[in-house]
Amino acid sequence: MFKSKIMLFVFIPFLMAAQNQKLSVYELKQDLTVFKEIREKANSGLYKYRTKQQTDSIYSWAFSQINEPKALLDFYKIILKITDFEGSLHNDTTLPENFQNKFSSGNVFFPYPVKLIEDKLIVNFRNTEIPLGSEIFSINKIKTKELLASFYKYYTTDGYNISGKSIGIAGSFARYFEMEYGSQKKFLVEYSLPDKSQKLLKTITGVSNEIRKENFKNRHSLPIDSLQYGKIKNKYSFKVITPNTSLLTINTFAIGNNAEDKEHLAYKKHLDSCFQYLSNNLQIKNLIVDVRNNGGGTDPNDILTFSYLTQKPYRENAEAYVNFQEIPFPNYLVYEETEPQKQHEERKDFEEEIKEEFPKLENGKYIQDEKFNALLQPDKNSFKGQIYLLISPRIASAGSLFASLATGRTNAIVIGEETMGGYYGHNGHTPVEYELPNSKIKTQFSIVNLEQDVPKKANQIFGRGIIPDREVRQTLEDFLKNKDTQFEYTLKLIEQK
């Protein structure tokens, strides 16, 4: 699985007329009850980061919010709040298709891309109104801290992680603002110029969705973060950058669909040649592994790559389990097939696969069969020098599983920023999607609860992303110069050895 939620929210549309159509209290309560029961029966990660008491508490809050008819968008925000609270980056919640076929009309979007730099909201676009690099303190009298907190629910991350939400905010700020606060034709912005303390006020005009998208494509930081938001063409690369240092870059693990796929086999051949070269050139004592743009992908690319970095046997998981063998609430399930008979066959095939991989019931959990989690061996040409692992908030799913193994089971010096994917585990692999009966909101989550095969470490905190040994973030000066701060830091660290 991989985290690819940016495009969902960059392009989520909604019809202004539909906002005025309200769901009755009965319909709202029925949908929320169905939603709650689905999570309890099917979602093995429901209590991974939250206790039952905490989970019951947020549902009590949710039910208290629907004592009168509500517009679909308002109910959607309640559901988002719950799915974000659960703490899984594979949780996706989408509006009905008729909300996704047309965009809001008019010049109602905040015009300029922004980016979080050193926890400050910075203008990320050259323009004549609010200069590039300016810090934003408030918009329409809403303080930045309040703005950002209200946007967190739109972009889920593992556990209690906050750093990963910066990816969603930078990619979808204008969409989040419209969704949260409604259409605005004017924006009163309180800001300061780069490296200045004086606060200024400027009223700027909203733009159309088309201009918003065009401005994002032309953002200042594009040379640095293009791979975090666009289609990845160059998925991996290897090069020798100094006589004693090589760089392995893996921008995604979406490299073929399975172990037999030609694209995966080509990747395997590439890794073989790279590490055979390193094995034959022992003067290369340093390997930089850059996975900062890696939002995940497919098995077995992540664990195959790790085999070239370790000297000891390893597994993908310490434990994996699901809550069910027969899909709960099949009437609300979203099927790929459209004909009832084929839907029945689709469900039965899915359930047979679940029963094969998770056959044994122990303490209310269906445990993964060991044959699906074999003990794996290091490659004969695995690297034996010093590893430097570059990480960022973008790393998720299979990307964070790989990074956690490299962090916990190699000599890697981990450099960069906390990932959105967890160190100790996550819910992943197998997604299911349901549609609520009245609102037609779709909710997707992954059903396999994974505990990753990593040791406990003092600096790795349960419920957080992978925390670097050396936190290195872009400064405002680096941002303005589009400087690759983490990479340059790593090269200097190697030079000082």
What are the functions of these language-model segments?
Residues 20-322, 329, 333-338, 423-436, ...:
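Flexible, low-complexity junctional segments that flank or bridge functional domains
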Residues 134, 299-479, 493:
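Conserved acidic, small-residue-rich alpha-beta core segments centered on
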